[in-house]
């Protein structure tokens, strides 16, 4: 019998081999190419790996340990995250087939392990195209690009995005991107490879449902679905519930308005009984959201429920997420949202009375907006059809106190959403979506749908610190064409969704990495230069998307309900805001083209949260500033340490990055504002969201809003929330004309989770111990459905 020393590894083929420190070190060194070796130490990683070994460890487990070890050293230098990812990617590459077409064949030929039935994981159509074009597609893939992901990004891909057989990943990231591209473009191989390259080089990404499902047997690639309750009856309520379940099963996020459901105590004509109102019904929806988890626990189901503040059950509705109170009055898995008419805000401002009504007794309030709504509401008040009269500020205080406790409800403005919508010719828009960036018309026979993608703005900053608007416009046009194609090839879980999407053809372009873009340009987030760039970026995207949509209309005709829309009358989004665009784009020529050909898509712009896809690409989310410069983040795939890589690079170049500096940063909860020795220009550039005026954030949202024909997921951050402060922010946003006043209210925890391993008293001396983790505000993971 062969003897082994006390520690051996088990190779992939089952052979046993003695552990060799030099071999481990050599492998880590090979994967450290191009990294800053003044700060990345392969030997230090290898020493830690050796100390964690046990007898019989497999080489796969050894690689996982090495990757996690490198990831744990990210707070020393951000390039450890790249090294960690390279080790993990190398491990995956060893386990998977490098030939794209062969991997797709394996996925197509998959048989159910228990029944033996053919259960293909990619569609017959997708496989036929790949088989026919195998050589061209195989040679187009650049596997080295897998090594450009950060560890955090790669682990996110592993957890939810790469296809698995019997729980084993068989797909590489580059193969996933090519599958997605073929699923969108079919046999248009040139366009598929173009899309693959743009995603692979991280200029843009399609939304999570598209990455999950493109090319599969059920290619449900849409992110957002907006529903109106079909009718106020048992049949209507449960029909709508079934629709929500089918959509959620297919990875769609849901926005549902319940304005028309009668209030508590209303008479039920058929049985001569009385209604239990909204709350018991919403608890049923809550349980459905918990039960339907989008297949294999990829993501929990998520429903946002919208209600107008005149509804007689409004006080109970707003309290649904409270941590205390009777369980039968709570629905903590629903996301609550208010659809607020201007009249309510005016009455709060003037400290006037507010009347609560039942939609059964006061019909039509949800079917109109603006002056028509105000006239009907006043008519019902005059006729005495009111259930209850309260001070408007009493309800407002109730809303704000719940926001302080739970971060909800979302605030969306009904009149701004309708007044500035290109879909206003369809009827009254009654709600937004799960993440408050989609503003689309829905009806009992129409479920609004939106397909999303986001542009990684950091990629458009040149080495000379110039912003490449030409490339931005070029990529925007590709995305617009892609999203338009998805409308046609998409699988629709319910027919009402197909009906709506085919008629109106809305799409949603968003961004990620705006904060990274500003940092690369050396612009503090709210500086004059950043504000100007913010406007020009969104003007460019809107212009390019309109131009691409017009070119599609020239080929295929405008969308079915184009006539009568504001754009058909020459009214573009910035016209509705009363804003004059810059001279950067040739708007006069584009207006003439649109007047002649129309546009193919009713809506184009919708900056979404990008929670998951920004993690994959290593960017800060969406339009948000950084929340901290150093923190741990808990997501589905585990706990990861995140360091602001731009700041680290600056501190390293100036010789300021030391263990002591790292621990000062942790002790200051990710802020550098009070750390001595850091130059003022660095402090200004790396202000966290807690150190930026929220008034400035709202102003920048309004600036870009003139070019956003849907809306934007706008969070409000307040370290110490107060009634006065939140009220001030809401009224400022409303008066600025925002459609979405607030997505979440983000607050700091009462006690900051500073790691106990950091001894504040020892900060003046050299630190001896490695700090294993970092600090951050505690927040939910964010919406993954809308992650564009």
From Swiss-Prot:
Keywords: Allosteric enzyme, ATP-binding, Deoxyribonucleotide synthesis, Disulfide bond, Nucleotide-binding, Oxidoreductase. GDP binds at residues 208, 223, 433, 437, 610-613. The record marks 783, 786 as: Interacts with thioredoxin/glutaredoxin. One of its GO terms (molecular function) is ribonucleoside-diphosphate reductase activity, thioredoxin disulfide as acceptor. Its EC number is 1.17.4.1. The record marks 224, 450 as: Important for hydrogen atom transfer. GO terms for cellular component: ribonucleoside-diphosphate reductase complex. It catalyses: a 2'-deoxyribonucleoside 5'-diphosphate + [thioredoxin]-disulfide + H2O = a ribonucleoside 5'-diphosphate + [thioredoxin]-dithiol. The record marks 743-744 as: Important for electron transfer. ATP binds at residues 11-12, 17-23, 59, 63. It is an enzyme of class 1 (oxidoreductase). Under complex allosteric control mediated by deoxynucleoside triphosphates and ATP binding to separate specificity and activation sites on the large subunit. The type of nucleotide bound at the specificity site determines substrate preference. It seems probable that ATP makes the enzyme reduce CDP and UDP, dGTP favors ADP reduction and dTTP favors GDP reduction. Stimulated by ATP and inhibited by dATP binding to the activity site. Residues 7-98 form the ATP-cone domain. Disulfide bonds join 224-450. GO terms for biological process: deoxyribonucleotide biosynthetic process. DTTP binds at residues 232-234, 249, 262, 269-270. The active site is at residues 433, 435, 437. Heterodimer of a large and a small subunit. NCBIfam families: NrdE_NrdA. Belongs to the ribonucleoside diphosphate reductase large chain family. Provides the precursors necessary for DNA synthesis. Catalyzes the biosynthesis of deoxyribonucleotides from the corresponding ribonucleotides. This is Ribonucleoside-diphosphate reductase large subunit. It comes from Caenorhabditis elegans.
């Amino acid at each position: 019998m062969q003897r082994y020393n006390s520690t051996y590894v088990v190779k992939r083929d089952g052979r046993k081999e003695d552990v060799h420190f030099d071999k481990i070190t050599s492998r880590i060194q090979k994967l450290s190419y191009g990294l800053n070796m003044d700060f990345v130490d392969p030997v230090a990683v290898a020493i830690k790996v050796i100390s964690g070994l046990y007898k019989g460890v497999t080489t796969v487990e050894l690689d996982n340990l090495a990757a996690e070890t490198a990831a744990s050293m990210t707070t020393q230098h951000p390039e450890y995250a790249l090294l960690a990812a390279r080790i993990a990617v190398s491990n995956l590459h060893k386990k998977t087939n490098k030939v794209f077409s062969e991997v797709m064949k394996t996925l197509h030929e998959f048989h159910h392990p228990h029944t033996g039935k053919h259960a293909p994981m990619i569609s017959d159509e997708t496989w036929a195209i790949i088989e026919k074009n195998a050589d061209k597609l195989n040679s187009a893939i650049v596997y080295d690009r897998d090594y450009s992901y950060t560890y955090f990004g790669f682990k996110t891909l592993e957890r939810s995005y790469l296809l698995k057989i019997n729980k084993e990943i068989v797909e590489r990231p580059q193969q996933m991107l090519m599958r997605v591209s073929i699923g969108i473009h079919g046999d248009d191989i040139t366009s598929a490879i173009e899309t693959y390259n743009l995603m692979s080089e991280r200029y843009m990404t399609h939304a999570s449902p598209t990455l999950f499902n493109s090319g599969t047997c059920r290619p449900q690639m849409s992110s957002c679905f907006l529903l109106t309750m079909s009718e106020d009856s048992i049949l209507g309520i449960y029909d709508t519930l079934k629709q929500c379940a089918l959509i959620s099963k297919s990875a769609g996020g849901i926005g549902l308005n319940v304005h028309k459901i009668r209030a508590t105590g209303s008479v039920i004509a058929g049985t001569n009984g009385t209604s239990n109102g909204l709350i018991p019904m919403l608890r049923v929806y809550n349980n459905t959201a918990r039960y339907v988890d989008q297949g294999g626990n990829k993501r929990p189901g998520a429903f946002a429920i919208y209600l107008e503040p005149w509804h007689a059950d409004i006080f109970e509705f707003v309290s649904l997420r409270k941590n205390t109170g009777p369980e039968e009055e709570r629905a903590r898995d629903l996301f609550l949202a208010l659809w607020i008419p201007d009249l309510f805000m005016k009455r709060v401002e003037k400290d006037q009375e507010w009347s609560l009504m039942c939609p059964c007794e006061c019909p039509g309030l949800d079917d109109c907006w603006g002056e028509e709504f105000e006239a009907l509401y006043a008519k019902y008040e005059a006729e005495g059809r009111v259930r209850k009269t309260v001070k408007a500020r009493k309800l407002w205080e109730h809303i704000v106190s719940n926001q302080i406790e739970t971060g909800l409800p979302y605030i969306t403005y009904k009149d701004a959403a309708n007044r500035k919508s290109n879909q206003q010719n369809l009827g009254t828009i009654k709600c937004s979506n799960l993440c408050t960036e989609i503003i689309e018309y829905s009806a009992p026979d129409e479920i609004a749908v939106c397909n999303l993608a986001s542009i990684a703005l950091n990629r458009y900053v040149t080495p000379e610190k110039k912003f490449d608007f030409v490339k931005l416009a070029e990529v925007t046009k590709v995305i617009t064409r892609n999203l338009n194609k998805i409308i046609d090839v998409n699988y629709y879980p319910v027919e009402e969704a197909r009906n709506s999407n085919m008629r109106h053809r809305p799409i949603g372009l968003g961004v990620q990495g705006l904060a990274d873009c500003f940092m690369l340009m050396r612009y503090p987030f709210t500086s004059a230069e950043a504000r100007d760039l913010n406007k020009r970026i969104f003007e460019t995207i809107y212009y390019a998307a309109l131009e691409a949509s017009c070119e599609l209309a020239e080929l295929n005709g405008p969308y079915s309900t184009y006539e009568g829309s504001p754009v058909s009358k020459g009214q573009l989004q910035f016209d509705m805001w009363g804003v004059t665009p810059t001279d950067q784009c040739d708007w006069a020529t584009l207006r003439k083209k649109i007047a002649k050909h129309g546009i193919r898509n009713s809506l184009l712009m919708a900056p979404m949260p990008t929670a998951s896809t920004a993690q994959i690409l290593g960017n800060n989310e969406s339009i948000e500033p950084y929340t901290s410069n150093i923190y741990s983040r808990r997501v589905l795939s585990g706990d990861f340490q995140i360091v602001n890589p731009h700041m680290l690079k600056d501190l390293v170049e100036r010789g300021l990055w030391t263990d002591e500096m790292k621990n000062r940063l942790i002790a200051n909860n990710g802020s550098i504002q009070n750390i001595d020795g850091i130059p003022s220009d660095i402090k200004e550039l790396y202000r966290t969201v807690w150190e930026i005026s929220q008034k400035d954030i709202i102003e920048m949202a309004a600036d870009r809003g003139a070019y956003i024909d849907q809306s934007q997921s706008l969070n409000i951050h307040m370290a110490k929330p107060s009634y006065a402060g939140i009220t001030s922010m809401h009224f400022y946003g409303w008066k600025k004309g925002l459609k979405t006043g607030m997505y979440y209210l983000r607050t700091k925890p009462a006690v900051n989770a500073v790691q106990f391993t950091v001894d504040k008293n020892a900060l003046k001396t050299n630190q001896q111990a490695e700090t294993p983790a970092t600090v951050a505000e505690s927040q939910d993971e964010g919406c993954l459905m809308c992650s564009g």
